[in-house]
Amino acid sequence: MAESYDVIIIGSGPGGYVAAIRASQLGLKTAIVEREHMGGICLNWGCIPTKALLRSAEVLDHANHFKDFGLVLEGSVKPDAKAVVGRSRAVSARLNAGVGFLMKKNKIDIIWGEAKLTKPGEIVVGKSSKPVVEPQHPLPKNVKGEGTYTAKHIIIATGARPRALPGIEPDGKLIWTYFEALKPDALPKSLIVMGSGAIGIEFASFYRSMGVDVTVVEVMPTIMPVEDAEITAIARKQLEKRGLKIFTSAKVTKVEKGAGSITAHVETSDGKVQQITADRMISAVGVQGNIENLGLEALGVKTDRGCVVADGYGKTNVAGIYAIGDVAGPPMLAHKAEHEGVVCVEKIAGLPNVHPTDKGKVPGCTYCNPQVASVGLTEAKAKELGRDIRVGRFSFAANGKAIALGEDQGMVKVIFDKKTGELLGAHMVGAEVTELIQGFVVAMNLETTEEELMHTIFPHPTVSETMKEAVLDAYGRVLNA
């Protein structure tokens, strides 16, 4: 007889494991199915290990500027690729084990294998086709295995994987995805990065800090295309100052593989083609949802462009089947997945006043140097929607703390509705702006007006004062510029 649960979640990434914990907290008998690593891509091969790599890059960048701070370094500092990667993998392993601990603590059953929906309320779990690839990421103890399981509610949280362009498919040797880029045996001397979204530009920034000659090729007119164009123009200037070569409105039309190198044919907006040769290429042209082999078609679950169609509560068109996180479509961000997981489970549990996920208030963060962070509408999008707006800006170059830190290259930009004073969007570039953006996220979520922001006391000296000054600037009241 099949073991029965209230909720079964397929996938243990940020959306899946957080949904499982919240379900258990609400008294629902819960199981989670995983075929590879607890914590999903984010924890094992994405958000967390890349931040560890970028921290090593940041420390190295600081060391190379000791003289600017009156410090004398005897000798030189150089990266040890093996040690840098080793630290990153150790950070990931620690958190991987932490997810297993949280499952045990919250009395959540772990089912190991690949799940397939056979009918509403039932899954069959078979052997995983993706075995654990690192000894520091062992299987949790006392997991359940292959078999049939039933549940009143089944949540699909299977995440996403790299998208590949025809003829330029990653081979794990010369053409990498994030997987190979995270754990190189040695640093290449030169690198082509195809795509300048968060994944592409973060790896470009990391490898440049490590001393690698990096070329970025982006098909759109600006890097980080989802971000505000004024902000990304500042970021591009700083990245190029660090030595990155960036092509926008350009595309890789074909590649030629050699013995230990790869040549990309890059077509620019004027129709000309350049040949760029490098040791390695990273393909970072987007991701697509993991919807295959789940039995969705047989059950009539709607999909669109490689993702499951779900509403703000995670409901699909088939009763009892839900989807959250990357597999449910953009923005494909871990924190959106976590929030969707909580919302979905609270709705299942029948809690009152559960609000659907508002994708317009999901912040985005890119951890390159300089960092970029945002929430809400860009200036271009606000105008496209016909909003009458006020725009405020404030430069880090006029902020005392930023100058003291030696981090005066940055800006905060805010967009308000001229009639209502509603904060429509906030955009930042500069050191640690990924830690600042949450202030505007809270303000937007609470529907804070411009007057309330202008009358909020910000501590001095802090870089966060740039946020208030940007708001003041939108209304002609800026104090320090």
Curated annotation (Swiss-Prot):
Keywords: Cytoplasm, Disulfide bond, FAD, Flavoprotein, NAD, Oxidoreductase, Redox-active center. Disulfide bonds join 42-47. The active site is at 460 (proton acceptor). The keyword Cytoplasm applies. Homodimer. The active site is a redox-active disulfide bond. Belongs to the class-I pyridine nucleotide-disulfide oxidoreductase family. This is Dihydrolipoyl dehydrogenase. It comes from Rhizobium etli (strain ATCC 51251 / DSM 11541 / JCM 21823 / NBRC 15573 / CFN 42). The gene is lpdA.
